[in-house]
Amino acid sequence: MKYLTPGPIQLPKDVLNHIKNQPYFHRSSEFKEIFSSVIEKMEKIVGEEVLILPGTGTFSIDTMVYNYVNPNEDVILIDIGEFSRRLGESLISRNVKLHIIKSEIGDVVTPDIIEDYSKKINDLKAIAMVHNETSLGVANRYIEKIQDLAKSLNAILLVDSVSGIPAERISKNIDVIATASHKAFMSIPGASIIFYSIKPRNFDKLPPSMNLNKFIDMKKRLETPYTPPINVIMGLDYSTNYILKVGIDKYAEIHKERTDYLRNLVKLKPVAKEKFGSNTVSAFYTNNTKAIIESLKNKGYTIASGMGNLSNSIIRIGVMGDVSLDDVKKVAEVINNYD
């Protein structure tokens, strides 16, 4: 079975070979050597400092929220889909004053709309957004302008890019980005990853497992406060080598090439507006979600259905990982048997 899913992805065999090895003791010099290498390469790929925690993409989001906003602070949420709403759930659990700007399905919210809305708020502390909305295959490519806007408003920008970076590139430093190991970084699930250009600003005590200041302090000694996801990091050691060998820009271009090929072949209507179509995950409208998924399974391919209210009316296809243009063609051929 080959996985063209939004994640976990189809892993290259070389990544799997690295992951299956005996885990190092996390206080050993052998682990520190790999940990140092992975940190250096990830920071080179994204251009910001990185922290690696045990967890998932969701835990990465929660950790970002709890370290960078405080109860009763005003926060704008840009809602472009299901994972935007999950980001909102995390913010609500933090007891912030949440202001939501919602887009139409397949579209994004532009910086001018956010700027106009912000004038209603006296003391805005943060803007929170999803960079690459996995549920709909939508990429918000205004992210750099939104970062500039946040700075001009004396607020910070919190970004969920779990299915985005480094395949869906960001061209400038963002205040905080939450992501994970099992999508475009091409490892297995198990690592919450946070890139940051500003230090945590929480005013209260946090659970030890999500206190980023602990991780920042121990990173200086190439250690983590608690047992890290060792084999995930071993996989990242190989995958980051691969990304840098291919080239950071070329790696993103490869995903765009696969996605463009897919969209040109598939006859169904894409969910995303053309200029906001994600380069890692594509979504298409269909009345035959279950039949398409079952037919592809019989051909040796797994794709995903929609989420929430769209679970039976769209399909989602990921092109991250070990996916060839031939795989894309075969998947499209099956899909095109259905209206």
Annotate each language-model stretch with its function:
Residues 313-339:
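PLP-dependent enzyme catalytic core of the Aspartate aminotransferase-like
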Residues 18-63, 67, 82, 86, ...:
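Conserved N-terminal alpha-helix of the aminotransferase class I/II PLP-enzyme fold
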Residues 37-45, 240-272, 295:
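Conserved PLP-dependent catalytic core of the aminotransferase class-I/II
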Residues 1-28:
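N-terminal "arm"/small-domain region of PLP-dependent enzymes with the aminotransferase-like
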Residues 69-123:
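PLP-dependent aminotransferase-like
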Residues 270-296:
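Conserved PLP-binding catalytic core of the aspartate aminotransferase-like
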Residues 109-161, 165-166:
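Active-site phosphate-binding strand-loop segment of PLP-dependent enzymes
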Residues 10-11, 182-261:
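Active-site C-terminal subdomain of aminotransferase-like
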